[in-house]
A protein has these predicted regions:
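Short Lys/Arg-rich cationic patches that frequently serve as NLS/NoLS or arginine-rich RNA/DNA-binding motifs
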Residues: 1-16
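Eukaryotic terminal intrinsically disordered regions
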Residues: 6, 173-180
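Compositionally biased, intrinsically disordered low-complexity regions enriched for acidic
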Residues: 12-116, 128, 146-169, 180
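Short, hydrophobic/amphipathic alpha-helical patches that form generic packing surfaces
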Residues: 116-123, 169-176
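Short linear, low-complexity motifs centered on an aromatic residue
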Residues: 124-149
Length: 180
């Protein structure tokens, strides 16, 4: 059985080379099948493709790196390559801080994911694994659940007018805020 697992993993190994506005000749290896073999503590409710189609980050996130990810992720993606546009967001609310704030707070791993958590998630979903960085980002994702708890505690189910900014931020972290 473990032999089959090894050969299955070998089949999925692929090197991805990134050349976009933020990374030149950055390389990473896909060691897991796409969307599979996630850490047991990491159970996102939305895929990157679903998030992009719903409307996240004002549509201005990763507009220059489509070549890195599957084409179908962008087929229904709500994007604006020129500027951040809150009306693109599912809940029509600005719910993210700037990249400079993320850097100041130490949330960015410049070497691997200079765009932040969502870039990490997209690459993790694709099959890249970096154990220490994965553990750090999964801890951050789990800690974000406190926002879900606040919406559940303070809002009637599916009352989208109750805490829409917090709901939008939950979408940014792959929690499906449409269901709460």
């Amino acid at each position: 059985m473990s032999k089959n697992r090894k050969s299955s993993r070998k089949k999925h190994r692929k090197i991805v080379v990134v050349n976009d506005k933020m990374q030149k000749n950055y390389r990473y290896e896909l060691t897991e099948p796409m969307g599979k073999n996630f850490d047991l503590l990491f159970r996102p409710e939305l895929t990157p493709k679903q998030m992009l189609a719903l409307g996240v980050f004002g549509g201005h996130y990763m507009t220059d790196c489509k070549k890195e990810f599957p084409r179908d992720w962008f087929a229904k993606a709500k994007l604006n390559p020129k500027k951040h546009d809150d009306t693109i967001n599912y809940f029509d609310k600005h719910a993210s801080q700037s990249l400079s704030v993320w850097r100041q707070k130490g949330w960015i791993n410049e070497e691997h994911d200079p765009r932040g958590w969502f870039q990490w998630y997209c690459r993790y979903y694709m099959g890249r694994r970096i154990p220490d960085e994965d553990a750090r980002q999964i801890r951050r994702w789990r800690a974000y659940k406190r926002h879900l708890t606040q919406v559940v505690k303070n809002c009637r189910p599916r009352d989208y007018y109750c805490r829409p900014k917090q709901r939008q931020s939950l979408l940014h972290w792959a929690y499906d805020a449409r269901k709460i």
